[in-house]
């Protein structure tokens, strides 16, 4: 059968300087001094319980994982996320592909979030040169360097540029690793092809990021804390650019999934917080926990004393901890981010809250403030 393939080379790609953004970081950022809206008695108790469990996890050197959707970045929560990292309250951060992109755009230009409706109408949504070129190139270079998805972008932001290898070096790498590490050999070929196709020069490519102090993945890279990216093909604006390369996405995203799974292995007595992620977080967690349990069972152990808190705006009148899984004719059964996590054992709670209020309240209580 013959199928049509969309030719991205035919796209008219705009520059970010042409794009109007809805979020200006220095105008909209959430300050550590800002107070959250008041919670109900039940919500306050849940946050206190979470703080208690984080303190225990920190004492026992167990994982404290914070996984979130892109709106946590778009809501300018970087100051809180960075403080949680720097003060040792979280050991792993994870987001989807959009979260990586919004964080990069903030580091690169201090603003993010285009008008989707208007730009789709004019055939321009997501079709921008800088994020498409630089983020994809960072991932292609990162695949060659055996980095993770988030790590590749964080390194580019931290160094404010990328090192482009000589073509001859890449060909030598291909020959050297063809049998011992075919993935690395393939990544070298991919990078060589990209360099030739786009006419890139070997050596240092400067890419200024004047707002990098606001980047969560930059701060994670500098602090040597995993910030993993978990993209899905076709979900993000970088897929519109001809620089996009599926093999590099796959190699770096797989590295990040395995790093995420390694943190789940250390989740006994630990804490997992899923904030505003209806699909990505529960899906990668269930596979990772199964893998982790597999290893623990081999050692005669089991992960049982883990704490899970799910935070989302949607209201839920079902008590998952007390009532278990609802019947299939109940709407709560179809809340994937509750149902999946409830099947993962441990202690699980659901909190209906805005991510800004939750993270601010969590941080303030960890600091001993009200």
Predicted stretch roles:
Residues 250, 259-263, 269-271, 278-370:
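C-terminal functional extensions of proteins
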Residues 48-63, 219-223, 262-269, 370:
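Glycine-rich phosphate/diphosphate-binding loops that line cofactor/substrate pockets in enzymes
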Residues 115-223, 228-229:
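Ligand-binding beta-strand-loop-alpha-helix segment within the catalytic cores
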Residues 75-77, 82, 86-138, 211:
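Active-site histidine-anchored catalytic micro-motif
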Residues 43-48, 208-209, 231, 246-265:
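A general structural motif
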Residues 2-82, 90:
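N-terminal glycine-/serine-/threonine-rich phosphate-binding loop
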Residues 98-103, 235-238, 281, 315-317:
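Short gly/pro/ser/thr-enriched loop/turn and capping motifs at secondary-structure boundaries
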Residues 62-71, 93-95, 271-278:
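Short glycine-rich or small-residue beta-strand-to-loop segments that form or flank ligand, phosphate
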């Amino acid at each position: 059968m013959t199928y049509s393939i969309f030719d991205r080379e035919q796209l008219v790609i705009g520059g970010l300087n042409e794009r109007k953004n809805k979020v200006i970081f220095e105008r909209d950022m959430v300050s550590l001094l800002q107070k959250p809206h008041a919670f109900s008695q039940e919500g306050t108790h849940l946050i206190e319980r979470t703080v208690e469990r984080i303190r225990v996890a920190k004492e026992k050197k167990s994982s404290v994982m914070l996984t979130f959707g892109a709106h946590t970045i778009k809501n300018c929560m970087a100051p809180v996320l960075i403080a949680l990292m720097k003060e040792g309250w979280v050991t792993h951060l994870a987001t989807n592909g959009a979260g990586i992109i919004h964080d990069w755009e903030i580091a690169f230009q201090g603003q993010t979030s285009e008008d989707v409706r208007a730009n789709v109408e004019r055939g321009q949504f997501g079709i921008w040169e800088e994020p498409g070129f630089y983020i994809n190139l960072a991932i292609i270079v990162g695949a060659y360097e055996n980095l993770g998805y988030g790590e590749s972008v964080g390194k580019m932001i931290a160094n404010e540029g990328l090192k482009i290898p000589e073509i001859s070096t890449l060909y030598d790498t291909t020959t050297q690793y063809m049998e011992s590490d075919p993935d690395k050999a393939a990544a070298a070929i991919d990078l060589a092809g990209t360099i030739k196709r786009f006419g890139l020069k070997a050596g240092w490519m400067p890419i200024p990021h004047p707002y990098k102090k606001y980047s969560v993945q930059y701060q994670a890279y500098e602090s040597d804390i995993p910030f993993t990216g978990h993209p899905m093909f076709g979900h993000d604006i970088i897929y519109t650019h001809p620089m996009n390369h599926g093999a590099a996405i796959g190699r770096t995203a797989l590295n990040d999934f395995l790093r995420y799974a390694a943190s789940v292995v250390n989740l006994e007595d630990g804490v997992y917080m899923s904030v505003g992620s209806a699909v990505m977080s529960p899906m990668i967690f269930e596979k990772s926990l199964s893998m982790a349990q597999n290893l623990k069972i081999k050692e005669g152990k089991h992960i049982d004393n883990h704490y899970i808190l799910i935070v989302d705006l949607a209201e839920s009148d079902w008590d998952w901890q007390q009532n278990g899984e609802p019947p299939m004719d109940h709407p709560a059964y179809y809340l994937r981010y509750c149902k999946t996590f409830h099947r993962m054992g441990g202690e699980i709670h659901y909190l209906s809250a805005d991510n800004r209020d939750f993270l601010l309240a969590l941080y303030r209580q960890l600091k001993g403030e009200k």
